Amino acid sequence: MTTSGHACPVPAVNGHMTHYPATPYPLLFPPVIGGLSLPPLHGLHGHPPPSGCSTPSPATIETQSTSSEELVPSPPSPLPPPRVYKPCFVCQDKSSGYHYGVSACEGCKGFFRRSIQKNMIYTCHRDKNCVINKVTRNRCQYCRLQKCFEVGMSKESVRNDRNKKKKETSKQECTESYEMTAELDDLTEKIRKAHQETFPSLCQLGKYTTNSSADHRVRLDLGLWDKFSELATKCIIKIVEFAKRLPGFTGLTIADQITLLKAACLDILILRICTRYTPEQDTMTFSDGLTLNRTQMHNAGFGPLTDLVFTFANQLLPLEMDDTETGLLSAICLICGDRQDLEEPTKVDKLQEPLLEALKIYIRKRRPSKPHMFPKILMKITDLRSISAKGAERVITLKMEIPGSMPPLIQEMLENSEGHEPLTPSSSGNTAEHSPSISPSSVENSGVSQSPLVQ
């Protein structure tokens, strides 16, 4: 701005603008700065302006000052210190933040989320007062979940979080094609084959029956018990074979393989026998073709567990599961990172993820008009766990009632499984030698039994 043909002189002023050189601005903004001169600032200090110069209004000064400040780069702000959270309220491990209302570690956050989303039902095999810390947190799922509630973790937070994710993905779900990737297709085929080759379907078996205690319930029919325990031992060996054929299972530590097999063995045994249920005769058929009615199953050793198992078998009928779905569900039961005492639970969880995805896609492709069938089938795992927990207690009762007749492999599979007490005070030295169901490779030049789980 000029007046009377000459520019107003601009004296040096003490202020923030004097610390920055003016020369770069014409270089950076030549079209804007080139034709302008800075306004005089005399009026700010009470000095009259030189003749011929007008005093700018305060509004003009404020506007121009602000504009000038915007051109000046500010020094970078120092980074805030990292936020420090209180230890996990549940197990006292290092917290990763506030999850579901409390400070929690990643392990307890994931455990609580899975427990709520899957409606898990846990059982404490002690006095429901187990100590939960970073060392013991995987030993009792019941007490760990109760501790989560006690410290203030919120069910609603999990559900709200889930609903939020559902809304965010609802548009994607409408257009989802549910096509198998090559990897998932290969995984599904391997599991179907592993299941079929370790568990023949009902239509492949030549059924035969027995008249032994078929009409009325008794406490225990020793003849049926001997036959049942022999068949159960063979079934366990087939489950071990099935597990070893699951992609990735043998890549786990030996300890984790055994932990998973012990924890899931009864689940899979019950699932398998229930798929061989014939509702018209109310019978179940074993792998050698032996077919027992409900009364005989009770007398063979199932006892108070009998009606629970038959009810579960009836609930499976409307689901019309095929061999692929049964195999995948068995694999999901087995490979589960929630099992206590695992060395690498995160690795197990990651191994389970493609199994869940494969089952979801397979079910929805097979039943496109029944979108809710996948969660219905998956929820059967909760029922299986509840029944198998009672089944483990039943085996312990049988061990006390008929000492010396418990097959060693059944005993081993249930020993310390999911928090159960050992069936015997110490491992038997040479019982495995006398079991016709255990391969001779289980015993190597010694009278000491060696677990077939690690062969």
Curated annotation (Swiss-Prot):
<feature type="region of interest" description="Hinge">
    <location>
        <begin position="154"/>
        <end position="182"/>
    </location>
</feature>
<keyword id="KW-0597">Phosphoprotein</keyword>
<dbReference type="GO" id="GO:0003677">
    <property type="term" value="F:DNA binding"/>
</dbReference>
<keyword id="KW-0675">Receptor</keyword>
<dbReference type="GO" id="GO:2000647">
    <property type="term" value="P:negative regulation of stem cell proliferation"/>
</dbReference>
<comment type="function">
    <text>Receptor for retinoic acid. Retinoic acid receptors bind as heterodimers to their target response elements in response to their ligands, all-trans or 9-cis retinoic acid, and regulate gene expression in various biological processes. The RXR/RAR heterodimers bind to the retinoic acid response elements (RARE) composed of tandem 5'-AGGTCA-3' sites known as DR1-DR5. In the absence or presence of hormone ligand, acts mainly as an activator of gene expression due to weak binding to corepressors.</text>
</comment>
<keyword id="KW-0804">Transcription</keyword>
<dbReference type="GO" id="GO:0072089">
    <property type="term" value="P:stem cell proliferation"/>
</dbReference>
<dbReference type="Pfam" id="PF00105">
    <property type="entry name" value="zf-C4"/>
</dbReference>
<dbReference type="GO" id="GO:0002068">
    <property type="term" value="P:glandular epithelial cell development"/>
</dbReference>
<keyword id="KW-1013">Microphthalmia</keyword>
<dbReference type="GO" id="GO:0048566">
    <property type="term" value="P:embryonic digestive tract development"/>
</dbReference>
<dbReference type="GO" id="GO:0048384">
    <property type="term" value="P:retinoic acid receptor signaling pathway"/>
</dbReference>
<dbReference type="InterPro" id="IPR000536">
    <property type="entry name" value="Nucl_hrmn_rcpt_lig-bd"/>
</dbReference>
<dbReference type="GO" id="GO:0000785">
    <property type="term" value="C:chromatin"/>
</dbReference>
<comment type="subunit">
    <text>Homodimer. Heterodimer; with a RXR molecule. Binds DNA preferentially as a RAR/RXR heterodimer. Heterodimerizes (via NR LBD) with RXRA. Interacts weakly with NCOR2.</text>
</comment>
<feature type="DNA-binding region" description="Nuclear receptor">
    <location>
        <begin position="88"/>
        <end position="153"/>
    </location>
</feature>
<feature type="region of interest" description="Disordered">
    <location>
        <begin position="415"/>
        <end position="455"/>
    </location>
</feature>
<dbReference type="GO" id="GO:0022008">
    <property type="term" value="P:neurogenesis"/>
</dbReference>
<dbReference type="GO" id="GO:0005654">
    <property type="term" value="C:nucleoplasm"/>
</dbReference>
<dbReference type="InterPro" id="IPR047159">
    <property type="entry name" value="NR_DBD_RAR"/>
</dbReference>
<feature type="compositionally biased region" description="Polar residues">
    <location>
        <begin position="424"/>
        <end position="434"/>
    </location>
</feature>
<dbReference type="GO" id="GO:0008270">
    <property type="term" value="F:zinc ion binding"/>
</dbReference>
<dbReference type="GO" id="GO:0000122">
    <property type="term" value="P:negative regulation of transcription by RNA polymerase II"/>
</dbReference>
<feature type="zinc finger region" description="NR C4-type">
    <location>
        <begin position="88"/>
        <end position="108"/>
    </location>
</feature>
<dbReference type="GO" id="GO:0035116">
    <property type="term" value="P:embryonic hindlimb morphogenesis"/>
</dbReference>
<feature type="modified residue" description="Phosphoserine">
    <location>
        <position position="77"/>
    </location>
</feature>
<keyword id="KW-0656">Proto-oncogene</keyword>
<dbReference type="InterPro" id="IPR035500">
    <property type="entry name" value="NHR-like_dom_sf"/>
</dbReference>
<keyword id="KW-0863">Zinc-finger</keyword>
<dbReference type="GO" id="GO:0001657">
    <property type="term" value="P:ureteric bud development"/>
</dbReference>
<dbReference type="GO" id="GO:1901363">
    <property type="term" value="F:heterocyclic compound binding"/>
</dbReference>
<dbReference type="GO" id="GO:0007165">
    <property type="term" value="P:signal transduction"/>
</dbReference>
<keyword id="KW-0238">DNA-binding</keyword>
<dbReference type="GO" id="GO:0055012">
    <property type="term" value="P:ventricular cardiac muscle cell differentiation"/>
</dbReference>
<feature type="region of interest" description="Modulating">
    <location>
        <begin position="1"/>
        <end position="87"/>
    </location>
</feature>
<keyword id="KW-0862">Zinc</keyword>
<dbReference type="GO" id="GO:0061351">
    <property type="term" value="P:neural precursor cell proliferation"/>
</dbReference>
<dbReference type="GO" id="GO:0032331">
    <property type="term" value="P:negative regulation of chondrocyte differentiation"/>
</dbReference>
<dbReference type="InterPro" id="IPR003078">
    <property type="entry name" value="Retinoic_acid_rcpt"/>
</dbReference>
<feature type="region of interest" description="Disordered">
    <location>
        <begin position="47"/>
        <end position="78"/>
    </location>
</feature>
<dbReference type="InterPro" id="IPR001723">
    <property type="entry name" value="Nuclear_hrmn_rcpt"/>
</dbReference>
